[in-house]
Amino acid sequence: MEPTAKGRTEESFSYVIRAPSSEGFDIMNVDVKIDTSWIFQDMEDSAEERECLQEEAAGRPDMDMGALRRQLESSEQKLSAAEDKYVTSESGLRSRIQELELSERKLLRKVDQLSTHVAQERSAWLQAQEKLAALQGELASQIREESVARRQQWRLRRLQERLRRKDEALGQQAAALERCRRTQRRQLGLVREQERVLREQVQRLERNVRRLCRAAGLLLAQWDTAAPGSQGATEAAAELRALQARAERSEREREEAARSLQEHRATERQLRGQLEELRCCIYGLKLSEIGLQGQVEDLAQQNQCLREELGAQAPIGHCSLDALGCVQGDSLPLPREEALDPCRSQDWRNSLRSNDAPRQRAPAGQSPEGPCTWSRIRPGRASSVLAPGPETTSELPRDLAGSNREQLTLAEPSLDEQILLLVCGCPPEECLDESLLRMDLAWISENLAADPAAEAFLLVQTSALPLWGPAGDSASWRPLLLQEVPSDGQKIQEELATRSPPPPKATGHPGWDCHQTRGRGASLFHEAPYISNHPFLKKHPKDLKDTWNNGGGSLAGRTEEGKARGTLGRKGKNLGDKYQLSQESHQNLSLENGAGAAEDVQDQNGASETKAATCRPGSWQEFLMPLLQGEASVSKEGPESLSRRERVEGYVWGLRGGLSSENEEVAPPATFSRAHETKEPWPTDSQLLAGKVRATGRTARGKEENQVWLGNALLLQGGSLEDKGLEEEDEMPHQEASGLGCRGAPEEPDSQEHESKEMLFFAGETGLPLFPRFALSVEGAEPTDHGHPQAVSKGHNRCALTIDELAQDVEACFQQLSTLQPGSRGWQCSASACRGENWSFAQKWHSGWERAHSQQVWGNWGICSNEEAKSKESGEGDKPGKTTALGTSEVPGNPGTLPHWDEASPNPPQGPAEPWGALERVRSRFHQLISGLKKQRSQILHDNTKLHGDQERFHERVCALEREREREVTKISRLERDNHRLVGDISQLKKELDQYLQAISDLEDCNGKSYCKILELEEENETLKGNLGQLQKATSESVRKSKDTMEQVTLENWKLQTLISELGVSYKELIKDIVLGIEDMIRALSGENEHLLRRVHVLEREVTLQRSTDQGRLVRGREHLQGKAKMHALDKEVQVTPLTGQLLSRACGPPLEEEMSLAAGQTGPSTGTGNSRRGADSPPPSLVWRNTGVANALQGNVSGAEVKEAHLEKEEKRPRCSVAQGQALSSLSNGPMLRDSEAEVTEEDPRLRAQQLHHRVLTLQCQLRDQGAAHQASLDEATRLQEELQAKLEELQKKQHEAKLAVTPLKAKIASLVRKCRERNRLITHLLQELHRHGLGNLLLSELAQNMLNDVALAEYTATFLAPGVPETSHHLDVKSEMTAALRAQTYLLNPEMDSVLQSSLSSESWPIPEPEWPAQTAQLDSLKLPLSLVSTLDPGTCLAAVTVEPGLPAQRLQEKGGMPCPALQVDNVPAPSELLSPARILAFHQELRQSICSNSQVHKSPLELEM
């Protein structure tokens, strides 16, 4: 053999395996070396030995059989050495196989680690998905909370708007409450009544509905249970009609109830209007009654005054108690006053009884009234102020009414009226030549307001004039109004302002202690602690307003009641102004204008103007009578009427005692609730103090005092009258108060009553004297009638006697004066005495004329009152001209108009005596006066008689009115109870208003908290959005990394599987080549043995034939043998050619033909006789070309290292075939040479040749025996290898089953993930709809959600993994798309559900597929179609040798290698999409993986089994 051939007898196989790991890629190099030179080594050695033996035999013919035996033994040793080498190489190959198995196990472990890593990544991805779902849930909840918060915010805004509107409405209602408070009360009662009626109606209707339902149920039950018939249908129809009629009747009843409710409301309004009119009428009757009483009492008082002035001229001394006894006899009982406050009545009685114990009035510095004390402020000797001490402030009202109860506390002073009593007088020595002290009433009110804690009962003495009796009588004082003094008044103001009330002590007027006989009259002043306070008296309305705002108390809640009395106050003010004009025209001292001034004060904030009450010259009992009568006449009306009475009594300042606590507690609101609407200028000092001294001089003071007393007495009486009018106005919400009941007066049918009411109205408004009928007695219980007829008649006789006696005395005086001579001393004394008597008489005459003038005023009063009433009706009440006649009317013979009246000076002249003519003129004037007085006496007696008749008639009328009043009082009490109930309702409404305000504040607080919460939620939402974005980014990054890792793992798994498949194919090819080489060698050896046997037989025949030849021919034969040596060589080549071609065709026929076809580029028949062998054992040319094309076409898909390995294998196969061919040719060429040499040897030495042949036969038999043993050993080894492979196959099948079990939950998770994704998409869609519906759409969020919803891969997975059937996948796929799909979707392949579905679908078909389908499946690999006849005749070995690994289509590759068909899925007409993440491609790859796992058993099968 050639050296080149010897160098290439050993073939090396190198494999580079790259496996992925955590650190990158593990590269493993596998080198397999196979030495094939041992196969034909022994044949070469035997050929050399034969040549040597032939040469030796040719050279030494005597060579024996021992050398041949040694050669055979050496050849046997070589064969055994070759066999040992073969065994050694086989053991090395076995060890290499073990190494490959270990590497395979490592690769499988690596695959397991990768799958574990994939599972971990999948779990991490699932956790990320769960977190994402949780965040989406939180986002959804936050969105819901935000929507709820926004809805709540919208509701809060709406509530705020509603509350704002409600606040506006409440403000309007608060403004309207002052105007229509009583309307709301009435409406509340009506609403409650309506509610009650409606509730009854609703209950009745509910009962009817329940009855109807029960009837309908019974009817339906009867309808269901009754047999079909005309009678049942008729009854059912009748019942239905009855039910319908009942329902209509119920509806009609409801409508009638609504109409009746409206009618009831209208009727109630009408009745309330009639009731208000009746109240006005009753009020007018009451005024008429009180006016008549005042007229009667005034007449009696005038008669008493006339009797006192015109009586006998008795010496003036201390006044007795007769006048007070008259008061006691004329007083009436006061059961109401005693019932209201028996303690006060007892104190009053005790104070009136103080004449029995005059010195015990003020022991230990206290008054006998108990806790009530007096403080004394005396600026000089000109004035004294009596005020209650601080103990009296502790007495609080016992019974509170309405909401005023809550506003009175112990710390606040009482808000009742202050009674200011101004008593003015002068001593006898100062009353004629000293001006009266001025006291500013507004200043007094200011001081009172500045010290509201002190009870204001002021007894201001501006002069030291006695209060009773004429001049020179210290026992009787004359009360006067305060007069203006420019300097002393200012001093008193300063001193009173700087002094604080001293500690309580019992003080009184300076003259009280000296006149204890007047204790009863004086004790009346000590009743002042029972009089209510009034701390709101100031000089100006602004001061009043400031006082009220700073420390007033509860006036703000009470000013509502004053608005209804505005008209009344205005009318009273107008009348007060009229009366002021009339009083100024007469130069009267009056404070009636204080009513209008008080109403002006009340316009600003409801303050009251200070009034002053004065007493006429006479007894204090007469002064106290109208004051106390005002209390007695009202005390019968109950606490409600008393409370209203005190509202008007605030206009007048006077002594008022014995009031109950109910009267005290509600007085201030009435006092300050007059005429808020009037806009009058603040009255000046001249208006406030109408008691200025006019131009008529000091001589008219008595007349002024008289008329002021009359006006103030009527004011005091009118204070007790006007409260009833105010009481009636509390019940008239829509009716404007017309002032003291005048509106109801014209409606009376009796003209006399009408006139009397007009007169009373005018008297009540202007303050003309209407004296009360009753006055308290000393004991406080027994009233009498002033107008008793006997007393009047007695007074008439006394008046007549007094005038006659006066005339006689005057005449006697003048006669005595006439006897006196001028110039004598006695004349002077008599003249001075006469002057004193004349001055005394002038005073008496002045008083008498004063009564006459007041009587003349009363005569003109009826006409003026009628004119006043007419002027009020015609709207001319404001004109002062209507009432000036009342004050300007003069009586003939008025002393003010008598000639030379001012000549009678107040003081007796101190100069020389007047002439006698003056005395005559005085005498004549006195005579005229006496005649005038007589005429007046007759006129007065006539008028008295008429008045007595009128008094009797009026008395009867008064009794009827009293009875009527009692009835009306019951009605009033009932109305008052309704009023209290309505007040409670108003308080309830106020509480509800407070609750509403509290609810509003709570809602505002809740709104603020909600805003804060919303801001916090928005911030948290933004934070969560940021976290969600970061999480999404991290999730996408992890998913991307996972996908990249999965792609890498899939690619590495694919490469690993490709390498494993290539290794298996290479190993099978190697084993097959080895087996084929051994078989060829055995065939060649068996043929050689047969040839040797034939040659042995030929040689034996030749030996037998040539034994007879001679020795001579031996030399010639030897030469001939040497000459034909070359020819033997050629002959040997010719003889060996068929065997060589056969061996070549067997040993390396297919590879050689493949190499020849690859080299030549075409197919053709091979040389020699190999065509017959090729027809049976090798594939046809088309198949070879096809396999070659497939290998060439698929080499492009393999990596560069694999391509190099394939080329290296091909290059190694070529020299192996050539070497084998050369060995076969050399071994076969030895046969003819040996035969020729043996023929010559036979010819030379037949025996020797026979022995050699026999030895050779034995050797060959031994060799055959050894080769059989070796063949048997190789078969055993092949069987063992097959068993090992079968065990490995079983292990792989177990691993496949485990992989299936591991893959099953992953597939279920994929399906569940698909379902969750669908649910997530639905939730996102719902959330987007909710956001758009609430107006919270976000474009970025909508686009993001739309991108998530438009996931094509998710839609395909949904259609694939959640479909009821599994679609069949088409195999018409390109390799690149399959690889990409395998890389991108390996995590979604291992679905147990899909695996079970695939197994069920695959089990429905048989594994072998029809032969016509197989070429169609492989048509994409080659454009040439394989004939059906050739498919069944394919040799698996040749197919395995010709096919390379195709990574993308393992199923088709395995079909070509082993001829095993694989199952194919049915096409479901689902076109494979072009996306790389197509589920169809994933399913196809999944199917191929399963087929590759199932076909592992075919890959590892033994080549002997493949042949079998």
From Swiss-Prot:
Changing residue 1382 to P: In a breast cancer sample; somatic mutation. Residues 149-267, 972-1034, 1271-1302 form a coiled coil. Residues 1163-1172, 1220-1230 have a biased composition (Polar residues). The keyword Coiled coil applies. InterPro entries: DUF4527. Residues 248-268, 345-403, 536-575, 725-754, 868-916, 1158-1186, 1204-1246 are annotated as: Disordered. It holds the Pfam family DUF4527. Keywords: Coiled coil. Residues 868-881, 1204-1215 have a biased composition (Basic and acidic residues). Signal peptide: none annotated. This is Uncharacterized protein C4orf50. It comes from Homo sapiens (Human).
